[in-house]
Amino acid sequence: TVAREQVELSDVISFHNYDNPRSFESRVTSLLLYRRPLLCTEYMARSNGSTFQGTLPVAKKYNVAAFNWGLVEGKTQTTLPWDSWQHPYIDHPPPIWFHDIFRTNGTPYSADEVDFIRSITGRGTPQ
């Protein structure tokens, strides 16, 4: 198939996965069969069961680079979930942020997430 040939001709494999940790791990193990470095260039969607605490340990276990889409709440509106097209969050924020990690004032959306990210990346506490 075309998809198989694309992967086989690639030096690295980049992919997106917004699913739960079990699905993420299944995707990773299937891609590892091609024996290429793996780059997960989008992975975090809290309301879809894809979280830092669920995804990053799997990525670390298999040495997969993981890039988060969204850092600070802002104009790109990546706090909004996919259903915001059907249910605009005009007068209230979504109950669960989709991507971003920090509010515009620099405070974390979830201190537990930030602590976890520091822990798993070996960054420790800020100076």
Predicted feature residues:
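Non-catalytic accessory regions flanking glycosidase/transglycosidase catalytic cores in CAZymes
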Residues: 119-127
